[in-house]
Amino acid sequence: MDADPVELRVLGCLLEKQRTTPDQYPLSLNALRLACNQTTNREPIVSYDEGEIHEALQRLARRGWSRLASGAGSRAAKYRQLFDEALGLGGDEVAILCVLMLRGPQTPGELNQRTGRLHAFSGIDAIHATLDGLAARGLVERLERRPGQKEERYRHLLGVDQQESDAQHSPTSTRSDELGSSAAPAGLEARVAALEGEVARLREALSTLARADAGPT
């Protein structure tokens, strides 16, 4: 799947608010903007405007993941998500994907703590079971445990988000970073060597001129 960062943030907010503030759901464009840009329970913090959010809603609608849902007499357009219906997801699966969309890669322990308002998991074993089910469907993947980490982390596979940790945890990206970091010093050394050679040539030219000036008149 190839949802972009704005789509993922908008979708995550629709899923979250449907469950945490059902009396205010569906959401208006302004309510979605506030939800997307709030500074709690969001990683990274963003500042999307209504135009960006509206365009993301249109892309989500084309995927069949959201739709306009204004009721009779409503003065503002409101939107709801169709993601769970489109993918046939249960409440436990939605809760985990929602947190991964809004907060980036998480450990099972973090998911157990942060899904409390979205779904009543019976414990960490239930989190693991749900993650296994999502992984089997190609919706999440387990990331390599980094040195010093006690738990593995999981990320969603719905698209590309803005979490730098995604690239840092990805084995492919990590390898690319290592190659880039090793290539940088080598390139720098080559430039320094070239500059040193140029300086040596300039010194030789100046020395030649000095000898010529000091010759017999």
Where do the model's predicted regions map?
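Hydrophobic residues on short alpha-helical segments
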Residues: E7, L11-L14, R33, E93-L100
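Short, amphipathic alpha-helical interaction segments positioned at domain boundaries
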Residues: A72-E110, E152, H156-G187
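Helical coiled-coil/dimerization "stalks"
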Residues: R114, R146-L158, E204-T217
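Amphipathic alpha-helical oligomerization/assembly segments
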Residues: E178-D213
